[in-house]
UniProtKB/Swiss-Prot annotation:
Signal peptide: none annotated. Belongs to the class-V pyridoxal-phosphate-dependent aminotransferase family. SerC subfamily. It catalyses: O-phospho-L-serine + 2-oxoglutarate = 3-phosphooxypyruvate + L-glutamate; 4-(phosphooxy)-L-threonine + 2-oxoglutarate = (R)-3-hydroxy-2-oxo-4-phosphooxybutanoate + L-glutamate. It is found in: Cytoplasm. This is Phosphoserine aminotransferase. It is an enzyme of class 2 (transferase). Pathway: Amino-acid biosynthesis; L-serine biosynthesis; L-serine from 3-phospho-D-glycerate: step 2/3; Cofactor biosynthesis; pyridoxine 5'-phosphate biosynthesis; pyridoxine 5'-phosphate from D-erythrose 4-phosphate: step 3/5. The modification N6-(pyridoxal phosphate)lysine is found at residue 197. It comes from Pseudomonas paraeruginosa (strain DSM 24068 / PA7) (Pseudomonas aeruginosa (strain PA7)). Binds 1 pyridoxal phosphate per subunit. The gene is serC. Homodimer.
Amino acid sequence: MSKRAFNFCAGPAALPDAVLQRAQAELLDWRGKGLSVMEMSHRSDDYVAIASKAEHDLRDLLDIPSDYKVLFLQGGASQQFAEIPLNLLPEDGVADYIDTGIWSKKAIEEARRYGRVNVAASAKEYDYFAIPGQNEWNLTKDAAYVHYASNETIGGLEFDWIPETGGVPLVTDMSSDILSRPLDVSRFGLIYAGAQKNIGPSGLVVVIVREDLLGRARSACPTMLNYKIAADNGSMYNTPATYSWYLSGLVFEWLKEQGGVTAMERRNRAKKDLLYKTIDASDFYTNPIQPSARSWMNVPFRLADERLDKPFLEGAEARGLLNLKGHRSVGGMRASIYNALGLDAVEALVAYMAEFEKERG
């Protein structure tokens, strides 16, 4: 097999080699059963065991309290932008949202279709280069919930703190930083995460929801979007994304073998520290984000001359450093360094950055 490239894509993102190798080994014949997981009935004993183990391992990794349901749903995180207000926002209620970038803005726009939204704080005041401190937030006392995106994959902003909401349920889009380090799940009413960054392949979204928030859906909420129905049916009201669920379970097993989220925190800290140190030590590369708000998972950076972007990307690809082009709305470069990428990937990237700067700077 040819050497695998280092994939810095924001999503769908790199998966651990060990997970892909195991999936390959089990592709045609899962544990001597003579069929692929893709061919299994989702209601068979074998598949139910696969699904149950995935949930058990995720609960173990994040130490999820027993009064929370873990749902493996379809539609990605973007569908949650509608599903959350349909389940949690009364028609005469108001929801607080924090705007820190493109994904939180999309959530705000969708929620406004279903009810009143109060944008309690916005990073726009800081050109989206910093996160407003909670002393700047204008929260609604009796809000149905407070929503924020813990990490903005495009802009590269990440909360390094959990907001205080005074008993109002806290809802977070954790698509790109879930499982990157330890988390106190009990601080949240609901956590959701699209799988294709730090969990597994696309086609799946994981929702962790406190049980007392179930059963609040509007009467007009579609059956398929009702959290309580999903919970009551073990996320199998209809056929789930079976293979994505299975692969996510393999990722959870791999994470436990690596030492869990505490080990991931050490690994991810080393990666992001090396990359930001390289950028900050250079006059050729820049990252505009306030240091306290810099993302551990998505590191945007610019070259001194944007005319060098194309040759930089071409040189990177020739060295097996893939998908470093920044989002079209931001430009520049972006290195997404999720759990599956090791320190060796970042070491290879910074070595190339130094080489390119020496030649073109």
